Amino acid sequence: MLFRSLVILDTQVPLGQRVEITSDDIDIERGSRSRLKVGGELARNDLLHLALMASENRAAHALGRTFPGGMTVFVDAMNAKARELGMMSTRFVDPTGLSSANVSTASDLVKLVRETHRHALIRQYSTAESHQVNVGGRSIAFRNTNRLVTNDTWDISLSKTGFINEAGRCLVMHAKIQGRPMVIVLLDSWGKLSRIGDANRIRKWLTSSAPPRAAQG
């Protein structure tokens, strides 16, 4: 969703505009769940907040569907932006990231993190601990999918998680470690908490005078 938010902000789509969740936003490819019910309305900035912070796929799809010109124009704009940033191994086919036909590389994602980090709103939304929205008279609270943003020992200024079976559990972050800005890209972690453990091990290795040896086996 980092890339989608970049395109939305670059094109200056009205963030205060109300967007209705429709049946078109239901994930039929993966069957992922959502607490955003069909018929509910949210401001576009709330959808952006939930997509960045909580990986809310229905929110991400609604953002693409209501982009000026529709979904096809949105995806085309994403691919054009990728080429502009020199992300030559990246290709998008949908705005949610749920399709395995969306492809990228670790080096391309470093370029993406550096570019999106320039946007204060993306930094703010992606690292928020929680966000509450009112939909149809009901208050719904969402939490960040990266538990490290609530860890006081980390200084994280941008974060995004992702998961599909083909890619595994992924995490990208822009963080400061001992005062040095770092971009961390973790792809295909095998367990729910392994990307968190991997991030902590990377930080330990960077801050240790005697880097730990790689695990055997």
Predicted feature residues:
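Active-site-adjacent loops and short helices of periplasmic peptidoglycan-processing enzymes
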Residues: 1-107, 114-120
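Penicillin-recognizing serine hydrolase domain
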Residues: 44, 70-217
